[in-house]
């Protein structure tokens, strides 16, 4: 499997245990040579990788580079990242979706979890708020060649009104406003998220 932009490694901690004995796990973070946020993320992630033998077999590639050989991967996963890839409309997201399609075997799966925006939210507002419309991702995937295989409401949250001063980062776990209305945002909980499964024909 490939995990796109693993951040600080929350899902890596789970996935590495499943893949250690009989699997191949490729993590594809931002290249730290980009500096700034990418470098800080890599510092945190590389510290995790060095903390336990369970991470010793993880292979590293980078977003926008060649993640793996074409048609060599069974599944690609991304969790709450697509809003970061639409700062220029959809150019970066298209590149990553195409790279994902290319590395997957026929019949392979692309799993997506993302903060869910209200219908008809503009791309500009999606980028600012961190919420992305379900249709935007489905259309992007279909344009790349994927078929929507399944979807789940396991990560849905009907309390999430999606109209906060600091976007999705107002809610936990970020709590960007710190103590301001903290109990209110803790009561809402984490964001309403779509969970989509695409397949390469």
Positions of the model-derived regions?
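A short glycine-rich, Lys/Arg-flanked "PGG" loop and its adjoining helix->strand segment in the class I
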Residues: 17, 92-106
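Short glycine-dipeptide loop
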Residues: 21-23, 104-110
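Conserved class I S-adenosyl-L-methionine
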Residues: 1-7, 34-39, 89, 108-136
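Short alpha-helix
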Residues: 130-151
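A short acidic, Gly/Pro-enriched loop at the edge of an enzyme's catalytic core
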Residues: 66-77
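C-terminal lobe and adjacent flexible extensions of AdoMet/dcAdoMet transferase-like proteins
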Residues: 181-201
